Amino acid sequence: MDFNRIITHMNDHHQDDMAVLCKKFGGEKEITDVTLVNVDFAGLDFKYNGGKTLRVEFPQQADAGSIKQVIINLCVENKPVANYDRIKAKIDEFRQEFKSCVLSTLDKDGLPMASYAPIIFFDGKYYIYISAIAEHYENLKRNPNQVEVMFLEDENKAKSIIVRTRLRYKASARFIPREDPIVEKVLDKLAETMNDVGGIKTIREFTDFDLVELTFGTGRFVRGFGQAYLIDANGEISHIGVKGNPHEKESDK
């Protein structure tokens, strides 16, 4: 593998991209005299601003066949966001991948409890179908406005175990009366999602299960280092740490 060709190409044609990486991962407001000095399958080494050095690790180990695309992705994904519509689309796409969600609720002593439940998207709203004997059932009854919902990327799909994509919302819960027609419609949707197997035929007849509507409020979406976004109550997006890398390094203390 001729790493020198990559170094020459980046230094000749991608000064702006390298400056963006140094700003974000080096926590700098201004970048001058940026040079790529070394490349390997784990990351890039830069010099900038009169001799400062910076190592930017790839999200996952590259090889001879993938290193070009890994560098392209690193540069593209860390460009300053000019239009948040693309991020909104990523959030919607990510959320729609899931058939279950992680729940954080408060128990009777006010302590947080983590659990999960199947989640159903129907007619623009989100629902969970839960048993009265589940711990989170009483937690939701007791504290319906103190709930968090998280969608977390599968470890096996993540580029790195420390940068799993995740989407989290503060939420409120509303129990739907069993006689409400929406209950059967949502359960039909759940049965369709599960191909009418996996126990749905049985549990939809249980009277100790309830349908709960979840209303999402503010949230946070994280795709990787320097790619964290706040979601306001209206669904508008803002970038966290826009003035450089928000993480403190040992040398910064």
UniProtKB/Swiss-Prot annotation:
Instruction: Enumerate the InterPro entries for this protein.
Output: DUF2470, F420H2_bilvrd_red/Heme_oxyg, Haem_oxidase_HugZ-like_sf, Haem_oxygenase_HugZ, Pyridox_Oxase_N, Split_barrel_FMN-bd
The GO terms this record gives for MF are: coenzyme F420 binding; metal ion binding; oxidoreductase activity, acting on the CH-CH group of donors
For this protein, the parts annotated as crossing the membrane are none
Keyword Disulfide bond tagged? no
Q: What is its EC number?
A: 1.14.99.-
Protein's UniProt keywords contain Oxidoreductase: yes
The record lists heme as bound by: 247
Pfam families attached to this UniProt entry = DUF2470, PNPOx_N
Q: What UniProt keywords apply to this chain's record, in alphabetical order? A: Heme, Iron, Metal-binding, Oxidoreductase
Which protein family is named in the record?
A: Belongs to the heme oxygenase HugZ/HutZ family.
What does this protein's UniProt record list under function? Answer: Involved in heme iron utilization. Catalyzes the degradation of heme to biliverdin, with the release of iron and carbon monoxide.
Fetch the NCBIfam families from UniProt: heme_ox_HugZ
Q: What is this protein's name? A: Probable heme oxygenase HI_0854
